[in-house]
Amino acid sequence: MAPKKAGDGVKAHPIIGRFGTSLKIGIVGLPNVGKSTFFNVLTKSQAAAENFPFCTIDPNESRVPVPDDRFDFLCQYHKPPSKIPAFLNVVDIAGLVKGAHTGQGLGNSFLSHINACDGIFHLMRAFEDDDITHVEGSVDPVRDIEIIHEELRLKDEELITQSIDKLEKVAVRGGDKKLKPEYDVMCKIKTWVIDEKKAVRFYHDWNDKEIDVLNKHLFFTSKPMIYLVNLSEKDYIRKKNKWLIKIKEWVDKHDPGALVIPFSGALELKLQDMSAEEKQKYLEENMTQSALPKIIKAGYAALQLEYFFTAGPDEVRAWTIRKGTKAPQAAGKIHTDFEKGFIMAEVMKYEDFKEGGSEAAVKAAGKYRQQGRNYIVEDGDIIFFKFNTPQQPKKK
């Protein structure tokens, strides 16, 4: 029997969320916390900094290149005419107000936009500015977090109640045994979200069948959330703000494991208008750096996305896949024929390629692997796929 290849036969744990790679992350927050400023600097700075294909889907949605030193190295090494990075789809969502779940403010429109997203950049304001009024009358980001969490939970409460009522009629009173397991799972979700008043994602032990039900309904509180704290330029540079510890304490208690990333919309806006040389000088003088690359990478990872590379003299490209994707399905991202006629994936680890300096050196070191159809592709793999070309039907 042939030895098992690395990565073969490993069962991937199911992921809560929409299946696919064209996933979106929405910027959510109360009015006047800096959402549009953040969206604009995020999209414009990345578009201006790199000569990559850039696409504004509409005024409130953009594709942002994911910064990656590995991609940059491969481009410098191969110097191809075509360079295509991975992208993060970002949506600027109108400000939420208290009572949105009942239709207050933009209410239902706001919630439908969140529903179309797969993750959330939860942006809150931690700076004072007399010229920018706060919808709640004062700056208190912890209160703002709780308002948004409660609005999303209350909308889920409404959706869960409706679903249970429908299932009860069919599965319990109607005796439909096929739907009884879904009804039981919905009752467990109800206990957690309605009785315990907690978000779906705060519970980390949903089993496979429960995740199947969650993915059928895609509740608001199941979406991964990254907490972005908008500071004044001064506070961001000195890394001090009275709210940061309180925000971190709240997140650690209620959403353990979630990222809290401070940034300064004011600083990012200032940097956007500088030349590359001016920007570098300003950052060095103030001993700081832009938070945007970290935020983009975090958003991409939160959507359970990763990418592998194809690299050569004609093109270096990052191909987006879901975590846990097997080699044939990864090949299918390039072309359906690659998946249908899949033979094997020849894989190099980026680190091995960089250290060795060439494909030949990786092979000489015995680190060039041939992987079968059960191989789970890892982030940053450099892959060459071998496949059979499907035969064309003979003309009569």
Curated annotation (Swiss-Prot):
Residues annotated to bind ATP: N32, V33, G34, K35, S36, T37, L231
Could you name the domain of life of the organism this protein comes from?
Eukaryota
**Disulfide bridge positions per record:** none
Q: Does the keyword Transcription apply?
A: no
Concerning SUPFAM superfamilies, the annotation shows: P-loop containing nucleoside triphosphate hydrolases, TGS-like
**Pfam families from the UniProt entry:** MMR_HSR1, YchF-GTPase_C
TGS domain residues: 304-387
- Give the subcellular location: Cytoplasm; Nucleus; Nucleus, Nucleolus
GO MF term (any one): metal ion binding
Q: Which GO terms describe its cellular component?
A: cytoplasm; nucleolus
Q: Where does Mg(2+) bind?
A: S36, T56
Instruction: Motif Nuclear export signal — list its residue ranges.
Output: 267-274
Entry keyword annotation includes Secreted = no
Q: What is its main location?
A: cytoplasm
Q: Which UniProt keywords apply?
A: ATP-binding, Cytoplasm, Hydrolase, Magnesium, Metal-binding, Nucleotide-binding, Nucleus
Give the required cofactors: Mg(2+)
InterPro entries documented for this protein: ATPase_YchF/OLA1 (IPR004396), Beta-grasp_dom_sf (IPR012675), G_OBG (IPR031167), GTP-bd (IPR006073), P-loop_NTPase (IPR027417), TGS (IPR004095), TGS-like (IPR012676), TGS-like_dom_sf (IPR023192)
OBG-type G domain boundaries: 23-283
Q: CDD domains, alphabetically?
A: TGS_YchF_OLA1, YchF
| Function noted in UniProt | Hydrolyzes ATP, and can also hydrolyze GTP with lower efficiency. Has lower affinity for GTP.
Family that this chain belongs to: Belongs to the TRAFAC class OBG-HflX-like GTPase superfamily. OBG GTPase family. YchF/OLA1 subfamily.
Quaternary organization: Monomer.
Q: Which HAMAP family match?
A: YchF_OLA1_ATPase
**Protein name according to UniProt:** Obg-like ATPase 1
Q: Which organism is it from?
A: Gallus gallus
The major lineage groups are:
Eukaryota, Metazoa, Chordata, Craniata, Vertebrata
